[in-house]
């Protein structure tokens, strides 16, 4: 739609809260946002200047819709549902759930204690999340020793080892009262909510009583249980002096990016954190609210008893998302320090991201720019590198890889089977490949490279330049990569006459050339091996009576490789679906071939 159409719609926007849906040329919803005042927010996209990522969004907008709500809170809830429904590609996309393990008491007649990563609305009791399965298993192991709930997923018809160990009440054989299960479940809930110290004190009394009664084996069992509680439940530093489950949020923004850190505090301990980074398009606090709304829509993010938020966040809106959780914006003390710590970690995470981006820029785009400067040519943003591969002239192939701004562009890689060259002639092979590649580039109007790299020296470079200039009328810089006696990149040859381009061996531009040469060599060798494997298999079977193209294919499919066929017996060859007499001929032929190869090696 025209910009006039958008301007007309902008003039009609109301001074009310609501959600807006941006659409592209196909009518696809590409972004959903919310606003306290729709008129101001939506108009801001089409006026003033924006950073590059917002500009990319605006360039794709050809239409928009909006929905008025009665409040900002209602707008937040609607936005969450619209994002969930349409999954717009410019909205915050939380990474796939890192599914943390939970301990669960199942809602069954004879309940079990299990570890699960799936949180369902099945009336089971869930505790966690735990930072990893090992930590969850450690806690479960203690509970199994203290509370003998059943272990079997289906009830057997006789007692198992757990019954004899005192870790199961054997409901498969004995009647167990529901009140007994309720008592154990209540104690487990208390234990996991921080009441393990009471359990520990009870065990210490029992241990002392057993020791006084000379029941040393029983006292030893109590001692082991106490040790398990101490090492598992008390080994982590306490972050709070109570046992309330909390999620602590902090966020930082920089260069159009937001990082949100969530600290999971369970039973007073910081057990894990969640880190999310994403570009944001609205006000930071608005996108932060959107993040929280989406965060608790995830099945494995169970809202805790309390959520701590930084200042200037609309706590009323968050409360609407998680109505059963207490929302706190701490003003002082340990709670405030935790929010500050989450912010500090978010800021560090963003700084690290940009430092890594700068380093990556240095080794890619920066290296390409300096390579062009060293060669005296414009920045070679698109480089196409070639390498030939053959063994004594058999199955000659060539390969081309493409690097865009210093990064491999694998969709632009190409393989070539050499058609016109007989025997090992590297120069003629290079001429054929350059001719085929750039004749097609001209014919189909494909992007021209800024630099062609040849794996070789003067002869290969001259062959490529001759075809480009005299046959195709192209003027593309051609350089050669020479290797030392250890087959490592040693120097770059360029110019007329050819000269060594002075590059520091520890420079990023030299490392870039190494990566290009290694990549094209790998690609060519891999293609050549694939070709040899296929043609080698078929050539050995050529001339065997009763083995035509169909049976060659059948043998290839059955054995998969020449090595396996060489090791096969007559009976094994017959299992490939060929008659006995043909299997005998194949075995006889391969045995003779193996003997001949062995004698050749000995000579």
Curated annotation (Swiss-Prot):
Residue intervals of the GIY-YIG domain: 15-92
Superkingdom of origin organism: Bacteria
GO CC aspect terms: cytoplasm; excinuclease repair complex
CDD domains to which the protein is assigned, alphabetical: GIY-YIG_UvrC_Cho
What keyword terms does UniProt attach to this protein? Cytoplasm, DNA damage, DNA excision, DNA repair, Excision nuclease, SOS response
Annotated ranges, domain UVR: 197-232
Cite a single GO MF annotation: excinuclease ABC activity
Compartments reported by the entry: Cytoplasm
Q: Name one GO biological process term.
A: nucleotide-excision repair
Function, as annotated, reads: The UvrABC repair system catalyzes the recognition and processing of DNA lesions. UvrC both incises the 5' and 3' sides of the lesion. The N-terminal half is responsible for the 3' incision and the C-terminal half is responsible for the 5' incision.
Q: Which family does it belong to?
A: Belongs to the UvrC family.
Quaternary organization: Interacts with UvrB in an incision complex.
Q: What protein does this entry describe?
A: UvrABC system protein C
Read off the lineage from the record. Bacteria, Bacillati, Bacillota, Bacilli, Bacillales
Gene behind this protein? uvrC
